[in-house]
Amino acid sequence: MIKVYGDIMLDRWIVGKARRISPEAPVPVLKEIEQQFCPGGAGNLAVNIANLNGEIGVYGSIASDKEGYRVIECFSNFKKINFRASLDSKKTTTKNRLVGQGGQHICRWDREEKYTGEDAFNRLLSELSENDVVCISDYAKGTVREGTIQRLLDRNCKILVDPKQNVDFYKGAYLVKPNLREFKNWFGKFSKEK
């Protein structure tokens, strides 16, 4: 089975029309039309795998706040996802976006606190089976920490990582997939001519 572990978030879009500039500051005034919610971070990875017809478990941490319950509600729409997140006292990480009707992003603000517990990882370890693949989605919010990779390697798992931290942090993983900015930070700029 595929297990996704990492920083679970809520993605929220407030979609509206921006037809004028505020008299209080040079910013657009957005008239809200609708709000949209979906799992973000490790939750987004879980949804993408489920949409490929994969059956998966998702592990991480959310809070028992309204955003955390919204994440649970979002996952209830996916029958192939076994939502195994732990509840924590921290705030559920939420990425809020103000978006005009044409898709133009006007603003984004984040609400977050670092996760400091071990419950999510201990639950993952207790439910690992032989031949499980663990996909780690690390946004450096505290879920993935020093020793995470080694403890999974000790359980003979294949580990695939979407990283945020230094490359050495993921030593031993089967696959580490940085984005271009992370790659350049780790190894420097590269030339197409070489």
PLM regions and their residue ranges:
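Ribokinase/PfkB-type carbohydrate-kinase core domain
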Residues: 1-19, 34-194
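Divalent-cation-assisted or electrostatically stabilized phosphate/pyrophosphate-binding catalytic cores
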Residues: 26-33
